[in-house]
Design a protein with these regions (language model features):
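Hydrophobic transmembrane alpha-helices of multi-pass small-molecule transport proteins
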Residues: 48-68, 86, 120, 196-215
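Transmembrane alpha-helical segments that form core, pore/gating elements
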Residues: 36-38, 56, 74-128, 143, ...
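Specific transmembrane alpha-helical segments of multi-pass solute transporters/efflux pumps
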Residues: 1-30, 65, 147-165
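Loop-to-transmembrane-helix transition segments
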Residues: 1-13, 77-85, 133-153, 174
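Helix-helix packing/entry segments at the starts of transmembrane helices
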Residues: 26-32, 96-118, 151-187
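Hydrophobic/aromatic residues within transmembrane alpha-helices
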Residues: 17, 22, 43-48, 99, ...
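C-terminal transmembrane-helix exit sites in multi-pass transporters
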Residues: 33-54, 179-198
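C-terminal-most transmembrane helix of multi-pass membrane proteins
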Residues: 139-141, 175-228
Length: 228
């Protein structure tokens, strides 16, 4: 129940925020979970290594390069909503790391899937969104794609993978979605990469690799989830 609620709230706040802010700012603010995850993880007893700090700073810099569009406007309501969404994404990653140690990952994913779906359906009714056959037909394939590939398969792999990966490193790996979307646009849609975007991809890759390297513990005692 908790995972489904966190997933729904994070996604909802991010999508509502996009109404008022730009895609570039939204992407950068959302990716701040890279920094928030290691901070929140300290509360649950996870260790913070020097390599984590270096990796997070490098990756966030890379995200900035990827999302930078030349100029940013002043902070608006959309930015605040997106930041709140980033906090819920952070809690989702940290909570998964805790729950997957004691519960079956597949069962967690199934529960998350149905709770998130129910909350989305309830939200649609509450906001008075019309539900006609024409709308259902038009939105059927996008909904099926998001439900099966993104929520169903994607988040299931995340939960199963986090059984053997500390939350800080998991957050860095999850942030690669920006890199994959950029490269997919380049390969499939023939979009051109700017020097900023290329630099961002390189920095994010360096940051993720750096976080995996052994280094001294800055705070706490390293706690790795048990492997099945």
């Amino acid at each position: 129940c908790i995972l489904g609620f966190l997933l729904f709230t994070g996604a909802a706040l991010q999508q509502i925020g996009l109404i008022y802010t730009t895609a570039g700012k939204s992407g950068f603010i959302t990716a701040l979970y890279i920094v928030l995850v290691p901070i929140i993880s300290l509360i649950f007893g996870n260790a913070l290594r020097l390599s984590h700090i270096i990796g997070c700073i490098t990756a966030v810099t890379g995200v900035y390069f990827l999302s930078f569009t030349g100029s940013y406007d002043a902070v608006n309501a959309g930015d605040v909503l997106t930041l709140a969404g980033a906090l819920f994404w952070t809690l989702h990653i940290v909570t998964v790391s805790r729950f997957v140690r004691y519960h079956d990952g597949l069962k967690l994913s199934i529960g998350q899937f149905f709770i998130c779906g129910f909350l989305n359906f309830a939200a649609m009714i509450l906001v008075g969104e019309p539900l006609t056959p024409a709308i259902i037909t038009a939105a059927a394939w996008p909904i099926i794609y998001c439900a099966v590939f993104s929520t169903g398969i994607g988040f299931t792999f995340q939960i199963l993978g986090q059984k053997g990966v500390p939350p800080t490193e998991a957050s860095l790996i999850c942030s690669l979605e920006m890199v994959f979307s950029l490269l997919s646009g380049y390969i499939i849609l023939n979009e051109r990469l700017t020097l900023w975007e290329i630099a961002g991809v390189i920095l994010m890759s360096i940051g993720i690799v750096a976080a995996q390297l052994p280094s001294r513990t800055v705070y706490g005692r390293r706690e790795i989830p048990e492997k099945s």
